[in-house]
Amino acid sequence: MKFIIKLFPEITIKSQSVRLRFIKILTGNIRNVLKHYDETLAVVRHWDNIEVRAKDENQRLTIRDALTRIPGIHHILEVEDVPFTDMHDIFEKALVQYRDQLEGKTFCVRVKRSGKHDFSSIDVERYVGGGLNQHIESARVKLTNPDVTVHLEVEDDRLLLIKGRYEGIGGFPIGTQEDVLSLISGGFDSGVSSYMLMRRGCRVHYCFFNLGGAAHEIGVRQVAHYLWNRFGSSHRVRFVAINFEPVVGEILEKIDDGQMGVILKRMMVRAASKVAERYGVQALVTGEALGQVSSQTLTNLRLIDNVSDTLILRPLISYDKEHIINLARQIGTEDFARTMPEYCGVISKSPTVKAVKSKIEAEEEKFDFSILDKVVEEANNVDIREIAQQTEQEVVEVETVNDCGPNDVILDIRSVDEQEDKPLKVEGIDVVSLPFYKLSTKFGDLDQNRTWLLWCERGVMSRLQALYLREQGFNNVKVYRP
């Protein structure tokens, strides 16, 4: 099988040297992602496209799906690459490929040609289109808005029969821009802003301020691992967790109620800037949107920015919440965000929307900054690839099984869309569907006399959720890995 990777248009307008660098980086990213599925595949770069060739037909859908999630790719074409002799040979091959698709439909033929031939692209379009119209009685030519467009590409003595076109996410290849550190909370905003910077070519590291204990960190790890695994797995990134409960405690004890929200955000920026400096990261990324909450007015954002020289990027600054939620739904983080608790908003009852710098600084003089230095120094830094491995260690008390007993029920915890696309069926065994984001509220409603075997496709989510349920006191859970 063969895929043709078409570049994001902004790459094609770069200077020759920059364009070549971007294409080289994108080629490497594609190799890094796809080697997990097929180590024998070939990735070949050209001036205006990249070819991916693989032998294992069983991996076709997996490879195609992975390609559509790599930043820098505008769209991919799944093609059948065959030799041809003349225009009539092109027509005959097109007839075999497209006959079933054109039955009872309107169609047109569109051809791209490169190389030396005694015919033009329009000649091929007319010849093939006329032939298909004659040989498929129920089909009809329609040049504007047809039901089916027959795409053909002629390259020297090769004919590319395009079997399907699939849109990519666009943007720049990861690694073409410098690294950033995303302040991730697991909510709608931080997940989307992280995705937007990945799509723009940045390697995104994650910094999490833990305000809610182990369960909160597990949830945010899930989001960060999901984003990395889905859109950024071509590169290694860090996940830095900072226990911010001592900082919140100091703020609650010593800071005036109205100033708490702004001062908490200033402390977060201070801490994140120290982490960014430690690892040579150029900018911070936040999910703040103008006017969304009290700390996100222009006055307050300016005061928050003042505590650090590090550049702070806010890709969602002009977005409304509905737009952000729609983007979260598109990239797959909506379900995580809906069940993620929001801790920042509960610490201040009457937050100021227009903080005064002198008042903020006066309040901060009461704060013991050694606490902030200590939590940053003790921050837990892990390679995001180790999150799954650490989960295995953390869930060591949760048994992993590969078969089922008479009292066992398999619990499919994938999202609803995944369950509908690939329903899980195990002969002779009950399978119950309960998406992972409903486990915290709905698992207790299940029959607790049964043993529940949590299952997801790759096993990461099931282990994380098993740990969470064990922490909640449910001992009748295991991880199912057939």
From Swiss-Prot:
Active site residues per record: C456 (cysteine persulfide intermediate)
Name of the gene this protein is made from: thiI
Enzyme class: transferase
Pathway as given in its UniProt record: Cofactor biosynthesis; thiamine diphosphate biosynthesis
InterPro entries in alphabetical order: Rhodanese-like_dom, Rhodanese-like_dom_sf, Rossmann-like_a/b/a_fold, ThiI_AANH, ThiI_fer, ThiI_N, THII_Thiazole_biosynth_dom, THUMP_dom
Name of the protein: tRNA sulfurtransferase
Residues in THUMP domain copies: 61-165
Domain of life: Bacteria
